[in-house]
Amino acid sequence: MAGACGKPHMSPASLPGKRRLEPDQELQIQEPPLLSDPDSSLSDSEESVFSGLEDLGSDSSEEDTEGVAGSSGDEDNHRAEETSEELAQAAPLCSRTEEAGALAQDEYEEDSSDEEDIRNTVGNVPLAWYDEFPHVGYDLDGKRIYKPLRTRDELDQFLDKMDDPDFWRTVQDKMTGRDLRLTDEQVALVHRLQRGQFGDSGFNPYEPAVDFFSGDIMIHPVTNRPADKRSFIPSLVEKEKVSRMVHAIKMGWIKPRRPHDPTPSFYDLWAQEDPNAVLGRHKMHVPAPKLALPGHAESYNPPPEYLPTEEERSAWMQQEPVERKLNFLPQKFPSLRTVPAYSRFIQERFERCLDLYLCPRQRKMRVNVDPEDLIPKLPRPRDLQPFPVCQALVYRGHSDLVRCLSVSPGGQWLASGSDDGTLKLWEVATARCMKTVHVGGVVRSIAWNPNPTICLVAAAMDDAVLLLNPALGDRLLVGSTDQLLEAFTPPEEPALQPARWLEVSEEEHQRGLRLRICHSKPVTQVTWHGRGDYLAVVLSSQEHTQVLLHQVSRRRSQSPFRRSHGQVQCVAFHPSRPFLLVASQRSIRIYHLLRQELTKKLMPNCKWVSSMAVHPAGDNIICGSYDSKLVWFDLDLSTKPYKVLRHHKKALRAVAFHPRYPLFASGSDDGSVIVCHGMVYNDLLQNPLLVPVKVLKGHTLTRDLGVLDVAFHPTQPWVFSSGADGTIRLFS
């Protein structure tokens, strides 16, 4: 670059008395135009390149004597003199240009942070106002400042964290939403602040203090400024203040302070009360309690039942006076004139006076509570829909009472067992009997396999459990079920089991029977595990083998208990955990099958438990009893009942939960089915909401029996009930 301050191109050796330039300085000096060139232009950038060259001419004479002399002759000296004169003429111009450049460069060094180059000119407003907009503010021209597109997911951030060496010092600007890289000075500032140090690294908080005003008395004053004139003349302002205060004292506006009284003062509560007033005397009066009125036992001619016998008289004589219910013995006199004087009259009056004199009296405020306020506010039933409200279908076909029923997992088929020795399969939508299987005995319990990929029904008949393939629905599903049962390979050494697995005959196979599990005692209940491979049965015996577990795939039976805890009424599997719930007459025990230990024991406070059901979530249990109680247990709350419902008038026979809706139902011998809304919240701090919503009636009482079993539809808010009248009813 050429400039007005540049010197002519010459070798370093041609300058007499000057130091030889460094190689990098020689590269910077290129052939600039001569100062004498009138066409050469002056600019700030050109002047700043060679600023300070005027110092070269001001070197000491010692450097001049050290330069090269002799051989160059007068010609070289003449050239050096001309060059020195040109540099001397250009020096003032270069110096002024250098000072102007320095002023222009330092113009904004002392500016405050309020004048920084802020890209977002939205102002001092919360940026949360722009969370739902694609921009973050407006520029000086009124155009929107759009947010940068953030399409990077967590994987991209992780890659940046691994690949980018400056990831740890990159932050996001909240004003513009862009990523900023912290400089070394900013990082060092953050480190100092984290260590509790000052932000300025050059600040020394422990500089030595200079005590200017020391304790030594100096001869001369610190300042020797002459005093003002106003310090020698009276102040007019103070004169006006004094005159105003004197005028206020004369007018009585300013009063002198009262002398302080050192004696303490106390507030008298009864200073304003008149002791002779009627209300004052009777305000704290509490009347004495009245004597109890005499009863029939104190009559001179009491009824015969109030007269004590000889045994009661002797027992009364042996008791302590404090333990006696009556402090006298009732007596009978023929007439009132034959009644003698009461021997304890003076003693009772003396005790009465002692009670009035010594016993303190207390005024009890009676609280008037509206009975309606004590009843909890429950939501209206119409706000809790859907739930079954009316009878939709009646399934007729059984000739005797229907003890049990079960619905298929898909909700299309219904199985029922009766005392007439038949097992019927119904179509739910049309109430049509699709198939009737004669089993030759009373069917006490029936359960459809909950696994939707297996078409299998288990029925308890006398001392056997029958596994039946109903052959309804998908043919591939029916065929796969038969293949699953036929794929069993018996072990080489059969183990001793508490039950016998028998193959059915060809005739029974044609009717749909597949397996028969024989037991030593009659079977009262059968239930499936949620996965459909295990089966639990209850036997009517007092032994430890009254509860058995069967595995269908391996045809293996086992007894989970070593000793009996009473007569078992029913069992159930936990829907999500390896728990087995066993209900006896007075308690419900929860066993952990993997750990083989008792987890919890529930006390329903009922005389005789009849049925039990587990909530689909697994945290709540309901059980019915023969003393017309329905008990709700919250397993997370306590082992005692959360709530006891007494809506039925007779014994409860069955209870059930809906798999999807917050509904549960109970069937009783009074011929009714009561549907209740039971909402279980995910919040553990909120208790379940139990509201009875509908009473369904339709069954007729037969032999003092009503509803024997209830079951919900798996997907619809429908409930099925079987009764002693031989019918099955669907309420929707």
Swiss-Prot record:
Q: Give me the stretches of Low complexity compositional bias.
A: 31-43
UniProt tissue specificity: Expressed in brain, gut, heart, kidney, liver, lung, muscle, ovary, skin, spleen and testis.
Please give the GO cellular component terms listed in this UniProt entry.
Answer: chromosome; nucleolus; nucleoplasm; PeBoW complex; preribosome, large subunit precursor; ribonucleoprotein complex
Residue numbers bearing the Phosphoserine modification: 112-113
Which residues does this entry mark as bearing Phosphotyrosine?
A: 108
HAMAP family assigned = BOP1 (MF_03027)
Purpose:
Component of the PeBoW complex, which is required for maturation of 28S and 5.8S ribosomal RNAs and formation of the 60S ribosome.
Quaternary assembly: Component of the PeBoW complex, composed of BOP1, PES1 and WDR12. The complex is held together by BOP1, which interacts with PES1 via its N-terminal domain and with WDR12 via a high-affinity interaction between the seven-bladed beta-propeller domains of the 2 proteins. The NOP7 complex associates with the 66S pre-ribosome. The PeBoW complex associates with DDX27, BOP1 interacts directly with DDX27.
Q: What is this protein called?
A: Ribosome biogenesis protein BOP1
* Organism this protein belongs to: Mus musculus
